[in-house]
Amino acid sequence: MISVRRGLSQLWYWGKRGVIGIIALWMAGILIFAFLPVPFSMVMIERQLGAWLTGDFAYVAHSDWVPMDEISPYMALAVMAAEDQKFPDHWGFDVGAIESALSHNQRNQKRIRGASTLSQQTAKNVFLWDGRSWVRKGLEVGLTAGIELIWTKRRILTVYLNIAEFGNGIFGVEAAARHFFNKPASKLSASEAALLAAVLPNPLRFKVNAPSGYVISRQQWILRQMHQLGGKTFLQENTLD
C-alpha cells in the first residue's frame, strides 16, 4: 500500500513538473516570437509526422518567413475580410461572433460554425495540436490572451500570414504565392490574395489551383468585403500596413 502511494506521489510530482515545464516553454515562445521569426508551427510538425507515419517521405511542410513589409497589403486585408473583420478592435476574442456561432450550432448541429479570431488561430497553429476538445480550447484561450498581451496586432498578423496553411505542405503566404502564382508575396494582387484567403477554412479540401464554384464565390465575397472595409486605408488607419 505504501509503495502504491509512493508511486502515485512520484507520478503526481513529475506530472506537475511536466505541466509547469510546458507552460514555461509556451511563455518563452510567446516572448521570443514577439521578435524572432517562427521557424515552424505545431500544425507543420503534426502534418510532417503524419506524412512520415503513413510512409509519405516525399512530403515536406514548407514555409518561407517574410516580414510584413514584404507581404502585399491586399493579403493582410483579405484574411481580415475573410476571417476576422474586427481584428483591430478586439482583445483576442469576438464576443458577438461567439454568441452567433453558439446560436447557429444549437440549431444546426450537423454544420458546426466556428468563431475563432485571427489571434486564436495564430495561438492554436503555433503552439497547439489540431482537433476539438475542451482542454485544447481552454489552452487556446490562455495562449491567445498571452499573445494579445505581448504581441502587437501587426505582429500577430505577420505570424499568422507566415504559418497559415494554404495547401498540402504549403505554409505561409510567401510559399503559397510562389507555388500558385510564381511570384513573391509582395506582388500578390487583390484577386490573388482573396483566392488564397478563400481556401483558409479548409486548405486540404479547397484548392487554390483548382477552385470549386464555392471557392470562387467566396473569393468574390472577400473582394467585396475588402472594398467595404476601406481597402488599404483600413490597414493604414489601424497601423497594420
Swiss-Prot record:
Q: In which pathway does it act?
A: Cell wall biogenesis; peptidoglycan biosynthesis
Query: InterPro entries, per this entry?
Result: Glyco_trans_51 (IPR001264), Lysozyme-like_dom_sf (IPR023346), PBP_transglycosylase (IPR036950), Pep_trsgly (IPR011812)
Q: Which reaction does it catalyse?
A: [GlcNAc-(1->4)-Mur2Ac(oyl-L-Ala-gamma-D-Glu-L-Lys-D-Ala-D-Ala)](n)-di-trans,octa-cis-undecaprenyl diphosphate + beta-D-GlcNAc-(1->4)-Mur2Ac(oyl-L-Ala-gamma-D-Glu-L-Lys-D-Ala-D-Ala)-di-trans,octa-cis-undecaprenyl diphosphate = [GlcNAc-(1->4)-Mur2Ac(oyl-L-Ala-gamma-D-Glu-L-Lys-D-Ala-D-Ala)](n+1)-di-trans,octa-cis-undecaprenyl diphosphate + di-trans,octa-cis-undecaprenyl diphosphate + H(+)
- Could you tell me the superkingdom of the organism this chain comes from? Bacteria
Q: Can you list the GO cellular component terms from the UniProt entry?
A: peptidoglycan-based cell wall; plasma membrane
Q: What is an example of a GO molecular function annotated in this UniProt entry?
A: peptidoglycan glycosyltransferase activity
Query: How does this protein sit in the membrane?
Result: Single-pass membrane protein
In the record, biological process GO terms are: cell wall organization; peptidoglycan biosynthetic process; regulation of cell shape
Q: What are the record keywords, sorted?
A: Cell inner membrane, Cell membrane, Cell shape, Cell wall biogenesis/degradation, Glycosyltransferase, Membrane, Peptidoglycan synthesis, Transferase, Transmembrane, Transmembrane helix
EC number in record:
2.4.99.28
The Swiss-Prot or TrEMBL record describes its family as follows:
Belongs to the glycosyltransferase 51 family.
Q: PANTHER family attached here?
A: BIOSYNTHETIC PEPTIDOGLYCAN TRANSGLYCOSYLASE, MONOFUNCTIONAL BIOSYNTHETIC PEPTIDOGLYCAN TRANSGLYCOSYLASE
**What is the official name of this protein in its record?**
Biosynthetic peptidoglycan transglycosylase
This protein's species is: Yersinia pseudotuberculosis serotype IB (strain PB1/+)
